[in-house]
């Protein structure tokens, strides 16, 4: 039976995302566990167009976009020491972390 922990990181700022991945990778490597990644996932770009003027000038518009960067880390065959090390990692406020436990048969 082979277990895996998949960690998905998501952020609007790529600098804070890279810093968070470095902290997680160093914490896992200190426990001598096998880690794959960081694997960069496709970025999601959301674009919004709004009118500058509420009435007359319909051709005058502003365009905004939000870029969401994503990374994936996979820890093969984790032990309780790895889970304890992951719980002690302090990450930046702008980074969203999703942790999935996958058990193989």
Curated annotation (Swiss-Prot):
What GO CC terms are in its UniProt record? ribonucleoprotein complex; ribosome
Keywords on record: Ribonucleoprotein, Ribosomal protein
Does the keyword Cell membrane belong to this entry? no
SMART domains in the record: Ribosomal_S10 (SM01403)
Q: Which Pfam families match?
A: Ribosomal_S10
Read off the Gene3D superfamilies from this record: Ribosomal protein S10 domain
**A Gene Ontology biological process term:** translation
Give the matching InterPro entries. Answer: Ribosomal_uS10, Ribosomal_uS10_dom, Ribosomal_uS10_dom_sf
Which GO MF terms does the UniProt record name?
structural constituent of ribosome; tRNA binding
> What does this gene product do?
Involved in the binding of tRNA to the ribosomes.
Q: State the family it belongs to.
A: Belongs to the universal ribosomal protein uS10 family.
- Quaternary structure? Part of the 30S ribosomal subunit.
Under what name is this protein listed?
Answer: Small ribosomal subunit protein uS10
This protein's encoding gene: rpsJ
């Amino acid at each position: 039976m082979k277990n895996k922990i998949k960690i998905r990181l998501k952020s609007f700022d790529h600098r804070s995302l890279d810093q968070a991945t470095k902290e997680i990778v160093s914490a896992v490597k200190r426990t001598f566990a096998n880690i794959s990644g960081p694997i960069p996932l496709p970025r999601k770009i959301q674009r919004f167009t709004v009118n500058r003027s509420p009435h007359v000038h319909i051709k005058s518009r502003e365009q905004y976009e939000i870029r969401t960067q994503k990374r994936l880390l996979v820890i093969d065959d984790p032990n309780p020491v790895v889970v304890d090390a992951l719980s002690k990692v302090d990450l930046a406020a702008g980074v969203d972390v999703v942790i999935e436990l996958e058990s193989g048969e």
